[in-house]
């Protein structure tokens, strides 16, 4: 995740996800709706990996009384979140750090979008357990990120489709084959079955797939009682 401390990479961030993630605005909208099923009008929502601020802005606009806390390890990305939020920024609390930086209080819901695929299996499990520890029983967690089949040929095929989507949206890719191989080797990608297993190990129940777009998958799950 070192690129998120690169000022030029950070400057490109607000445009990049829109061209790389199919239906990003709809993903934010659906995430908010899934949270809204359980989060009260003045509820507390924890956003892990909040740098950039795109989902924070979507939630702040749609649910003006939610108390939003965004956590991210990258100071430049948090600065970008402030810019993205604009006049909404005073309504959002931002913390630099990983999940451990978030206060150990009971939130009404949590979100983690486009973040978990940067974490190893052990780091993901730890992050999910810490998220569970900060949620009220029955509270929703919404997460979405890259998740591809485990078989090498299937993994490369789906990553190829993702890269094709990027390039069709004008994202410059000098060598698609090299990009595909780099993603396969550098990102600790998990298959959907492993993702669900991690949720269960971390203490989440009733997991449901709500979003699938090429390599991206999104789940909602609920903190166990």
Where are the regions a protein language model picked out?
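Conserved class I S-adenosyl-L-methionine
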Residues: 1-40, 142-168
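Class I SAM-dependent methyltransferase SAM/SAH-binding core
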Residues: 44-46, 52-101
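A short acidic, Gly/Pro-enriched loop at the edge of an enzyme's catalytic core
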Residues: 102-110
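A short beta-strand submotif of the Rossmann-like class I SAM-dependent methyltransferase core
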Residues: 112-115
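A short glycine-rich, Lys/Arg-flanked "PGG" loop and its adjoining helix->strand segment in the class I
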Residues: 125-137
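Short alpha-helix
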Residues: 185-202
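Core SAM-dependent methyltransferase catalytic element
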Residues: 202-225
């Amino acid at each position: 995740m070192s690129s998120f401390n690169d000022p030029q990479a950070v400057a490109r961030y607000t445009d990049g996800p829109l061209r790389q993630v199919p239906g990003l605005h709809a993903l934010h909208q659906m995430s908010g709706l899934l949270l809204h099923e359980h989060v009260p009008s003045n509820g507390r929502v924890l956003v892990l990996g909040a740098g950039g601020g795109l989902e924070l802005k979507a939630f702040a606009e749609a649910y003006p009384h939610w108390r939003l806390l965004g956590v991210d390890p990258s100071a430049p990305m948090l600065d970008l979140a402030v810019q993205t939020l604009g006049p909404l920024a005073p309504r959002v609390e931002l913390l630099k750090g990983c999940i451990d930086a978030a206060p150990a209080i009971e939130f009404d819901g949590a979100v983690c979008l486009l973040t978990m695929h940067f974490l190893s299996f052990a780091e993901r499990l730890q992050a999910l357990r810490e998220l569970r520890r900060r949620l009220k029983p029955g509270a929703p967690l919404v997460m979405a990120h890259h998740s591809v089949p485990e078989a090498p040929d299937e993994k490369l095929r789906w990553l190829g489709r993702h890269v094709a989507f990027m390039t069709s949206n004008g994202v410059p890719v000098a060598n698609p084959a090299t990009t595909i191989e780099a993603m396969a080797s550098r990102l600790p990608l998990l298959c959907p079955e492993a993702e669900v297993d991690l949720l269960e190990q971390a203490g989440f129940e009733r997991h449901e797939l709500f979003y699938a777009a090429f390599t991206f998958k999104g789940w909602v799950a609920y903190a166990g009682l």
